[in-house]
Amino acid sequence: MPTAPRPFLIGVAGGTCSGKTTVSERLAELTGDEHLALIKLDSYYVTRDHQPIAERALANYDHPDAFDWELLNDHLAALAAGASVPVPVYDYVHHTRSGDVKMVQPARIVVVEGILVLYEPRLRDRFDLKVYIDTDADLRFIRRLQRD
């Protein structure tokens, strides 16, 4: 029995409110949702259960150390091998993982989107296509004010 081909991996990076999610969701629409798995880097913020909530709120979530790169790399390897992965669900109110997971199924195309997805070398080297969304800083600021 032939094995499924390795998925095409796309990394979509850019500043906060640059349009990463919009581009990624549009890709899903164009390819058909059943052919694309979307993973958000925000799901891989390190857990901060050991810290008081006031301390968690002060953490720099735009720093590379804020992410669990090892887990994300493991999940991409599993998806490439045809396995489903339990992606953590991040709780923005409590600044830590919720304890829930969202099962992501293997797909022909896997998109990983987030501010620093092109930062980590092992992750960056996995991508078949790397996209950087360059949006004017003033526009991103306005979008962030509207969103948050």
Model-found features: residue ranges?
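Conserved nucleotide-sensing/catalytic segment adjacent to the nucleotide-binding pocket
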Residues: 34-40, 46-94
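Phosphate-binding P-loop
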Residues: 2-7
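ATP-dependent NMP and nucleoside kinases share a basic, alpha-helical "lid"
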Residues: 98-148
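Post-Walker A alpha-helix
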Residues: 23-24
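Short, structured coil segments at secondary-structure junctions
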Residues: 32-34, 126-127
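P-loop (Walker A) phosphate-binding loop of NTP-binding proteins
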Residues: 15
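Conserved lysine of the Walker
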Residues: 20
